[in-house]
Curated annotation (Swiss-Prot):
This is UPF0538 protein C2orf76 homolog. Disulfide bonds: none annotated. InterPro entries: UPF0538. Belongs to the UPF0538 family. It comes from Bos taurus (Bovine).
Length: 126
């Protein structure tokens, strides 16, 4: 079976408290690659994107979580849902397809430490 190439939106989350995020669209993403390989690709690609402001290009992203899948319901959370971590956080050793990624899925890329701190105390600054 040939590998499937899809379009994925990656939401770069710089700050949960300030709701500071920037979406980046990736076309031709191979679903048979591992989550770890995709994270490595993102860490190499993001600093090279001149369209992103420096705070987004130079941030310490390390974790992926599904925000929204095509044709499914969306959450009311403005930045990222704090629910269903066991189902929506992507495990590095699985493939993107096995993790539930399909065409037009939106995933968040963020610092896991920031996420844990925000989840423990979910207060927005504005």
């Amino acid at each position: 079976m040939a590998s499937e190439d899809v379009t994925i939106t990656v939401r770069l989350i710089r700050s949960f408290e300030h709701r500071n995020f920037r979406p980046v669209v990736y076309h031709g993403v191979h679903l048979d690659q591992t989550v770890k390989d995709f994270i490595v690709f993102l860490k190499q690609d993001i600093p090279l994107r001149a369209s992103l402001p420096p705070p987004f290009r130079n941030y310490k992203y390390d974790k992926l979580k599904i925000v929204h899948q095509a044709h499914k319901s969306k959450t009311n959370e403005l930045v990222l849902s704090l629910e269903d971590d066991d189902r929506l956080l992507l495990k590095e050793d699985s493939t993107l397809k096995a993790a539930g990624i399909a065409s037009e899925t939106e995933i968040a890329f963020f610092c896991e430490e920031d996420y844990k701190n925000y989840k423990a105390n979910p207060i927005s600054s504005w």
